[in-house]
């Protein structure tokens, strides 16, 4: 049996596309546009795995489909190449992360090219290229000038043994993931970006986006907007005040103690001598825990009394002030008013430490559990008898009259901690002068280059390894002679990925981030496909930067990504996640070698819905290859010539299935329903095998529909059909509505209500003809033999009913 040689064909067409720059995007600003974007990969040492091509194939199908529909398509690829793994490699081996990164990019690029994606490689970007990060630094300066970048003392994960600060992901159960060394929370000066200033816009504009609702909800929850009140409690016998944010100011009469986070600025000044030692010990223990561990609902509550008291502003009662690690310094004000009768966590804490529980809303039994439902207020002074909403309004009014509180909107969203104590990242373009001032590097001096060094090692002080490089750090102002030190922290990996989709639009521009006319033409991104693991951070940060750039008049749209889609995960054969440790990772190189890139692309799209998590199956892969072989055998003779089965006259036998196929595939491509589109292509090929002749324009239409999914075999078959030019820009097939339905219908014939025959007749058969056809059918004749026909009822296109006695 003749099968096609995928190695030969795939190499041939990849070379052709490269030599002819088939997918080069021209900035034809008058043409209708489509911008299809992939989440660009981090080029790790492991290379591409079979999960990557799933999303890439989907955007590639859409890009190829849109080109055939006459769109000007922007479909680029690049590298998110700063980041921890390269730095780790450099620390472990002493090699420069640049070499490691360059080598990895070469591997990724080869693998991606071998999969036949239609990227315009002239637009490739790399976040570690100085010509790229020049503009990342430029955006930072705009943020700084707008008052959105500031320095703050922030508690970080400090690991003395490694001499470095770790990200939350690198700390597991209070020790470093690498080496298992103790990690402590330590305050350090850090750069922070004021994303909270955009919280309301980030929330409101989600409504206009064509994104999965579940993903929008993840962003809404992350921003976490809540309305309530800020309340001030005076600390007894001192000038201090404890400020709390609460969504339930109506329960203030039930606030029987306050809880501060162990890091709260007031703790040390209000703690009495008697409790100092206990408080200090508790603070040290808390500094070893991650926020996640501290807020784990299942864990046993811990805390210590400070010896200090506060005054409840409405009841005038004295209440104890405690510290506990379940209160985080980063949320709200870092302090809470505890209302144990009506909050589960506070109830648990009060029971453990024998603190008062005051019921202020009726409806529960606070002897047994906290009551968190609705009800009338009791034991609440002027709020007695009021329901929740009315009581909240009244409580805020009373607090405002006393100068002890006000209405407030709070966000769970924190400002974005932007500095990293790392070498392999974008240098932050700031100089700290000896007189205590700081300035940004003049824009004309950008990029501020990351210095090359043969020794990347932790500074030991918590600063980045850049602090070791005197020639980089120390500067002198030429005009004034004042000495300064460059900022030694670098930007996080998120920085470069916040705006890469803008640089693709004008990647070689030396004078500006991108030409405004081109930005106006291409934005917003029409389709963005990537993994759900970036649902919150990357997408939120990119939206934030985009909104700042919009306010600065640099980009023309409020939002970067109009439609977003998350592909599902490809699991191992046993339904578990693919991982090196399980030894179930599948390398696309092996599949390209054994089955071909077209088979891999077809299989990954045919596995199931694009957003579902599905297990890899060798049988499924083989099945996809068999389908391509069947297509090949239908069209190509053993000697490589076109089969004589393909003819230029239409005997109408495939009219219906062909037009159905064009309609179905077109509709499915629009909704990213590639698995059902492929099923329909298979239906068409099955029908072709059942007939003696296949009408050439129909098989050409089929090849056009197959080509976006399996482009190499698509090009090869297109050339076998006698075409000299690439299939890339051929017009997408259209269908004829009239041919979607049969010219024939099947009718049933009943004798005395019993089914006697099913007969195919022309659609426009008259009632009289229907009766004649029915009565001449052999089965019907046998049923009415020797009987008198009383009545014949014919319903066009449906049935003939014969009544006989």
Swiss-Prot record:
What InterPro entries does the annotation carry?
aa-tRNA-synth_I_CS, aa-tRNA-synth_Ia, Leu-tRNA-ligase, Leu_tRNA-synth_edit, M/V/L/I-tRNA-synth_anticd-bd, Methionyl/Leucyl_tRNA_Synth, Rossmann-like_a/b/a_fold, tRNAsynth_Ia_anticodon-bd
The name of this protein is: Leucine--tRNA ligase
Query: What Gene Ontology terms describe where this protein resides (cellular component)?
Result: cytosol
Documented EC number(s): 6.1.1.4
Recorded GO MF terms: aminoacyl-tRNA deacylase activity; ATP binding; leucine-tRNA ligase activity
> Which residues take part in binding ATP?
580
Please tell me whether the keyword Aminoacyl-tRNA synthetase is annotated for this protein.
yes
Q: Where is this motif: 'KMSKS' region?
A: 577-581
- Recorded source organism is Staphylococcus aureus (strain JH9)
């Amino acid at each position: 049996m003749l099968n096609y040689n995928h190695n030969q064909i795939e190499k041939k067409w990849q070379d052709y596309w490269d030599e002819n720059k088939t997918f080069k995007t021209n900035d034809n600003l008058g043409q209708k546009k489509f911008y299809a974007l992939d989440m660009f990969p981090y080029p790790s040492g492991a290379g591409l795995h079979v999960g990557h091509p799933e999303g890439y194939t989907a955007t590639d199908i859409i890009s190829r489909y849109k080109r055939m529909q006459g769109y000007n398509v922007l479909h680029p690829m690049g590298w998110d190449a700063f980041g921890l793994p390269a730095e780790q490699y450099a620390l472990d081996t002493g090699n420069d992360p640049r070499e490691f990164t360059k080598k990895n990019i070469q591997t990724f690029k080869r693998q991606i090219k071998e999969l036949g994606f239609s990227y315009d490689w002239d637009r490739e970007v790399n976040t570690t290229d100085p010509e790229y990060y020049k503009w990342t630094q430029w955006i930072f300066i705009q943020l700084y000038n707008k008052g959105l970048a500031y320095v703050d003392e922030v508690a970080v994960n400090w690991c003395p043994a490694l001499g470095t600060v770790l990200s939350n992901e690198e700390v597991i159960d209070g020790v470093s993931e690498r080496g298992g060394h103790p990690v402590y929370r330590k305050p350090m000066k850090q750069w922070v970006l004021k994303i909270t200033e955009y919280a309301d816009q980030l929330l409101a504009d989600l409504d206009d986006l064509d994104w999965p609702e579940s993903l929008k909800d993840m962003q809404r929850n992350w921003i976490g907007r809540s309305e309530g009140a800020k309340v001030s409690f005076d600390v007894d016998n001192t000038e201090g005040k404890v400020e709390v944010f609460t969504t339930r100011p109506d329960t203030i009469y039930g606030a029987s103690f306050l809880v501060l986070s162990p890091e709260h600025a007031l703790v040390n000044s209000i703690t009495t001598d008697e409790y100092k030692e206990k408080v200090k010990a508790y603070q040290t223990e808390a500094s070893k825990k991650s926020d996640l561990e501290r807020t784990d609902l299942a864990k046993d509550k811990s805390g210590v009394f400070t010896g200090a008291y506060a005054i409840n502003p409405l009841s005038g009662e004295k209440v104890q002030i405690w510290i506990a690690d379940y209160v985080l310094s980063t949320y709200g004000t870092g302090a809470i008013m505890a209302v144990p009768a009506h909050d589960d966590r506070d109830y648990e804490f009060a029971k453990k430490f024998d603190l008062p529980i005051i019921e202020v809303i009726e409806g529960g039994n606070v002897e047994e559990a906290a009551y968190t439902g609705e009800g009338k207020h009791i034991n609440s002074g002027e709020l007695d008898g009021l329901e929740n909403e009315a009581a909240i309004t009244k409580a805020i009014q009373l607090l405002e009259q006393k100068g002890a509180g006000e209405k407030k909107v709070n966000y769970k969203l924190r400002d974005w901690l932007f500095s990293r104590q790392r070498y392999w990242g974008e240098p932050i373009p700031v100089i700290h002068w000896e007189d205590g001032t700081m300035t940004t590097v003049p824009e004309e001096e950008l990029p501020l280059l990351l210095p090359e060094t043969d020794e990347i090692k932790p500074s030991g002080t918590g600063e980045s390894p850049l602090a070791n490089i005197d020639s980089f750090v120390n500067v002198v102002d030429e005009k004034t002679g004042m000495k300064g030190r460059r900022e030694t922290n670098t930007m996080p990996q998120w920085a470069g990925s916040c705006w890469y989709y803008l640089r693709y639009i004008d990647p070689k521009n030396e004078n500006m981030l991108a030409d405004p006319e081109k930005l106006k033409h291409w934005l917003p991104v029409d389709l963005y496909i990537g993994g759900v693991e970036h649902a919150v951070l990357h997408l939120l940060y990119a939206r934030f930067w985009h909104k700042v750039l919009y306010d600065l008049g640099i980009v023309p749209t409020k939002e970067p990504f109009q439609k977003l889609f998350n592909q599902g995960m490809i699991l191992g054969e046993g339904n578990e996640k693919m991982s090196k440790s399980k030894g179930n990772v599948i390398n696309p190189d092996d599949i390209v070698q054994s089955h071909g890139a077209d088979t891999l692309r077809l299989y990954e799209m045919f596995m199931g819905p694009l957003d579902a998590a599905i297990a890899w199956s060798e049988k499924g892969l083989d099945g996809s290859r068999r389908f391509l072989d069947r297509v090949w055998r239908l069209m190509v003779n053993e000697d490589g010539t076109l089969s004589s089965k393909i003819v230029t006259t239409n005997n109408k036998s495939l009219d219906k299935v062909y037009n159905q196929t064009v309609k179905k595939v077109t509709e499915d491509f629009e909704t990213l329903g590639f698995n059902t589109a492929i099923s329909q292509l298979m239906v068409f090929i099955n029908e072709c095998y059942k007939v003696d002749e296949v009408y050439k324009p129909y098989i050409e239409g089929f090849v056009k529909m197959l080509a976006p999914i399996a482009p190499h075999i698509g090009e090869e078959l297109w050339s076998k059909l006698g075409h000299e030019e690439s299939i890339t820009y051929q017009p997408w097939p259209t269908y004829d509505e009239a041919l979607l339905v049969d010219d024939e219908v099947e009718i049933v014939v009943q004798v005395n209500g019993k089914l006697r025959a099913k007969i195919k007749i022309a659609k426009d058969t008259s009632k009289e003809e229907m009766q004649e056809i029915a009565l001449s059918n052999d089965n019907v004749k046998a049923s009415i033999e020797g009987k008198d026909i009383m009545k014949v009822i014919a319903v066009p296109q449906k049935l003939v009913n014969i009544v006989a006695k």
